[in-house]
Design a protein with these regions (language model features):
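Short, ordered loop/turn segments at secondary-structure junctions
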Residues: 37, 101-103, 127-129, 154-157
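Rossmann-fold dehydrogenase core element
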Residues: 95, 110-129, 147-149
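C-terminal substrate-binding/catalytic lobe of Rossmann-fold NAD(P)-dependent oxidoreductases
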Residues: 2-9, 14-68, 146-243
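Structural motif
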Residues: 9, 76-77, 99-100, 125, ...
């Protein structure tokens, strides 16, 4: 069976390196392109802790798209890079998988229209870990019976966007299961601005950014005399690779 040819954008980022290793280690896939902002011409293998692989890092996206044979491009960069680069990728007839967060709903819809026009597949997910997907599904169901809820999400201190894409997706899913209402005391006030976190349809979300974390989230429900906490922890970035 012919292997699926995969390119990675953001190949030298934390997630990008993990994706490259996962692709190289999968018998059904072959890494044929690695796009990054540095290490031009260097073999991707040693840069991700593996032997030489034969694929060179390319810092010029135009050159990569012209020279590399790619079926699917995996993107873990940043929101602005996605908006700048993905239309060029899709115009080449390359399908795209996006794990980058920070895109607005309007931007996602715009990319969807561009993918449709280019007749390519586009898959965008806030989280590729099966445990995180289950957490969101369970939270959506729990909200039908326990509508008072807050979210605490915890990530490494290099993450740029807050709240996380997973938290935003969770909030939107929960919102489908409950009526919007203001939580907390009607006359509550903050002694320090932002103490109650961000708010979405009455639900509060809190973002923690510290060294040592990868990706974690608690969805806390409160009811009369009881609480329910649904938590997911990605202890390493390997947790995302089967989904990717």
């Amino acid at each position: 069976m012919e292997k699926l040819k995969v390119g990675v954008m953001g190949a030298l980022g934390k997630m990008g390196k993990e994706v490259c290793r996962a692709v190289i280690g999968d018998d059904a896939l072959t890494l044929t392109g690695a796009y990054a902002l540095e290490q031009q011409g260097m073999d991707i293998g040693p840069l991700i802790g593996l032997p030489e692989y034969g694929v060179k890092v390319e810092t010029n996206l135009t050159k990569l798209l012209e020279e590399a044979d790619i079926d699917v491009m995996v993107d873990f960069t940043n929101a602005q890079a996605v908006l700048d680069n993905l239309p060029r990728v899709m115009d080449k007839g390359i399908h795209v998988v996006v794990g980058t967060t920070g895109l607005t709903q309007e931007e996602v819809q715009g990319l969807g229209k561009q993918a449709e026009a280019a007749q390519v597949g586009l898959f965008i997910a806030a989280n590729f870990a099966i445990g995180a997907v289950l957490m969101m599904k369970f939270a959506e169901e729990a909200a039908k019976y326990m509508p008072n809820v807050e979210i605490i999400e915890l990530h490494h201190d290099h993450k740029l966007d807050a709240p996380s894409g997973t938290a935003v997706t969770t909030l939107k899913k929960i919102a489908k299961s409950r009526q919007a209402f203001a939580q907390g005391a009607p006359n509550e006030y903050e002694k320090i601005a932002g103490s109650r976190g961000g708010e979405y349809e009455g639900m509060h979300v809190h973002s923690v950014r510290l060294p040592g974390y990868v990706a974690h989230q608690e969805v806390i429900f409160g009811g009369l005399g009881q609480t329910l906490t649904i938590r997911h922890d990605s202890i390493s970035r390997e947790s995302f690779m089967p989904g990717v």
